[in-house]
Every structure is written in structure tokens, then in C-alpha cells.
């Protein structure tokens, strides 16, 4: 039996790819004005409308330990192997819930902190699933996941910091001071920490940085395997980023709506550029 690959709904992935590669996605949930929704049940566009209308910041929740245990028991027999790759513990307790669920299930589960989320998490999950489908061993898959993790960059742009302030996460972004709600901020997720790269006023902050990123990639000479762009009502900049960066990678760049978990913290107008280097 091929090794089973599991992840969570903080991943941003094309549904067709998940089906084709038999990737099991365990849904996180979000509570808006007292009503809990599973990521399975709430379309992203509907979520953004509900979040905008809500007086309070939605509350995101990791899957319960018991849900992970049930999933593992359902998809694999006792002798089968499972690799479960998840949202970084810097942002959620999902990894720990998966570990406990693995122990409870009695299955052979290896749980991995992706150190990332969104399409940066997808890079690891998709490659693991492709290798599993091809009959690779657990050791081969884990080695490849580690390589991708160590050669991935994630940049994120915030058009507003209102949700970060409400969620108490601004303190996690070093270097943020002053008038927080009016600035544009670009950060990076590295070594399980969200750090500030740049801040300024107006959308020109994003476009100037994009030029600098392009110049940096050009001068580095590093080859790129894949680029993913995700956004929360930040399509205009995302399309410009694809236009600027497509020349660096053969594979077409995916522009996707992010997920409810990430959008809760970023607020509207946010985007992320994720780069998987060869």
C-alpha cells in the first residue's frame, strides 16, 4: 500500500490536485458571531463577507484530537504508514493535535511541522503525495520534504493590521511600532517566526518591494521550481506579481484565494508570495 498523505485546510491547493494525488485534508473551523463553520462548509467569498460584517474577529480552531484519530483510522490499516504535514505551530496548535491523534489512533503516523502554511505547505504536501504514489519509502519522502522546507521562502503583505491587532499577533512581528492601522507591511515567515521586512504607506510600498524581489532573484542566480501566490481580496497586486515573476519559473504560477484561517489573521487586501527553490 502506498504511504498515505494527510494535511489540514490551512493548505491552499487546487481541489483537482488533492483528488488526483489522494491527499486527505482535515478541516479547521472558524467561529463567526457564535456560529461555528467547518472549512469544508464555508466558501471563501462567503467567509470574507461574514468577517466584514462581524463586530468581532472570527475565532479559528484546530481540528480536535479525536478527529485526527478518526481520519487516521479510516484511511489506513494498522500496518500502513501515514505522513501528516501541517500548518506551522507558530500559528496554530494543529501539529500537536495531529501528534496526539496519531497516538490515539494506534496507526503508524509521522507528523511533520511544515514551518509554513498556504501554498508553501502545498509544495511539501504535493511532492510527498507524488513520491508516495510512485512507491517511495517513508525515508525518501521525509528527506524530500525537509529539502523543500529548507529551500522555501514565504513573503506576506498586509494592507491593514486591524485583524492582527484584534488577534493579539502584532507583537509576534518584530519591528512594528507607531501608527499600526494605516501602514502597509511586508513580512516573512522563517524559522517559525513572522518578522517584518518593510513598512510604508500606500500600495506603492508593495510594488516597489516587488521590483526589489525581482532584482534579488535575478542577481541570485538560484533556480526556482515553483511559485505560488495567494490572496484575500488582493487580486490586483497578485496579478501584477505573477506578471513580474513568471519569467523566473517554467511552471505556470498559481493565483489562489487563501483559506479562512489565514484570512482571519491577515484581513482583506492581503497577499502571499511563496517560492520553492530547486
Swiss-Prot record:
Gene3D superfamilies in the cross-refs: 3.30.1180.10, 3.40.50.10170
MF (Gene Ontology): lipid binding
Keywords: Lipid-binding
Residue span(s) of domain DegV: 3-277
Superkingdom of origin organism: Bacteria
Keyword Endoplasmic reticulum set for record: no
Binding site for hexadecanoate: 60, 92
InterPro entries attached to this UniProt entry: DegV, DegV_C, DegV_domain_contain
A Pfam family of this chain: DegV
Function: May bind long-chain fatty acids, such as palmitate, and may play a role in lipid transport or fatty acid metabolism.
UniProt-recorded name of the protein: DegV domain-containing protein YejH
Species for this entry: Lactococcus lactis subsp. lactis (strain IL1403)
Amino acid at each position: 500500500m502506498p504511504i498515505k498523505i494527510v494535511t489540514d485546510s490551512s493548505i491552499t491547493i487546487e481541489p483537482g490536485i488533492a483528488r488526483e494525488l489522494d491527499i486527505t485534508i482535515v478541516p479547521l473551523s472558524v467561529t463567526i458571531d457564535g456560529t461555528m463553520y467547518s472549512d469544508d462548509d464555508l466558501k471563501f467569498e462567503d467567509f470574507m463577507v461574514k468577517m466584514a460584517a462581524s463586530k468581532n474577529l472570527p475565532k479559528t480552531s484546530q481540528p480536535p484530537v479525536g478527529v485526527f484519530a478518526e481520519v487516521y483510522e479510516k484511511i489506513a490499516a494498522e500496518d500502513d504508514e501515514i505522513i501528516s504535514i501541517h500548518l506551522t505551530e507558530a500559528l496554530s496548535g494543529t501539529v500537536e493535535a495531529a501528534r496526539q491523534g496519531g497516538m490515539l489512533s494506534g496507526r503508524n503516523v509521522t507528523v511533520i511541522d511544515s514551518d509554513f502554511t498556504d501554498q508553501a505547505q502545498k509544495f511539501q504536501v504535493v511532492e510527498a503525495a507524488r513520491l508516495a504514489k510512485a512507491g517511495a519509502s517513508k525515508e525518501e519522502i521525509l528527506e524530500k520534504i525537509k529539502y523543500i522546507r529548507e529551500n522555501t521562502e514565504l513573503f506576506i503583505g498586509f494592507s491593514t493590521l486591524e485583524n492582527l491587532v484584534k488577534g493579539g499577533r502584532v507583537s509576534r512581528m518584530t519591528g512594528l511600532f507607531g501608527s499600526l492601522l494605516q501602514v502597509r507591511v511586508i513580512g516573512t515567515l522563517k524559522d517559525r517566526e513572522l518578522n517584518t521586512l518593510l513598512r510604508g504607506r500606500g500600495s506603492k510600498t508593495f510594488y516597489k518591494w516587488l521590483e526589489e524581489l525581482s532584482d534579488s532573484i535575478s542577481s541570485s542566480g538560484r533556480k526556482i521550481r515553483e511559485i505560488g501566490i495567494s490572496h484575500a481580496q488582493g487580486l490586483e497586486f497578485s496579478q501584477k506579481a505573477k506578471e513580474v515573476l513568471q519569467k523566473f519559473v517554467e511552471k505556470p504560477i498559481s493565483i489562489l484565494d487563501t483559506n479562512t484561517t489565514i484570512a482571519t489573521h491577515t484581513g482583506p487586501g492581503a497577499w502571499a508570495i511563496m517560492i520553492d527553490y530547486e
